Amino acid sequence: MQASAPTTSFRLSFANPPGLYDPRPNGYSHLAMVQGPARLVYAAGQGGEDTQGYLAPDFATQVRQALANLRTALAAAGARPQDVAKLTVLIVDHTQDRLRIFSEQIQALWADAPTPACTLIPVPRLALDGMLFEIEATAAVAA
């Protein structure tokens, strides 16, 4: 299965090749490919802190806030979630329940658009006390 995000001078496409399991229920694609001239946008890891630096104590709220922070960072560079080619996700004390929460939020943010390639890394701790989730992104936009 292959789909493309709408672009003007380049093409960002995603694929889930035969012979690999279907990753879409977990909110990602196996491959992201950028063809043609593009400007790459690298968003640093976004955590679940609000504009005052407050971190909610629960995982789901941190995921929602981190994704909102990611949207804000991308927008500042002229990018949208659908322009993201690759995500790296860090989850403290990873469980299947936390994967479900993350997957549901990613699917809600991307809606019907194909989801990017993604690597999820379980970690014992993140930069700030109480931080449970962090997400970084690489996006491609028209040059």
What are these regions (language model features)?
Residues 1-68, 72-85, 92-143:
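N-terminal presequence-like segments and the immediate start of the first folded domain
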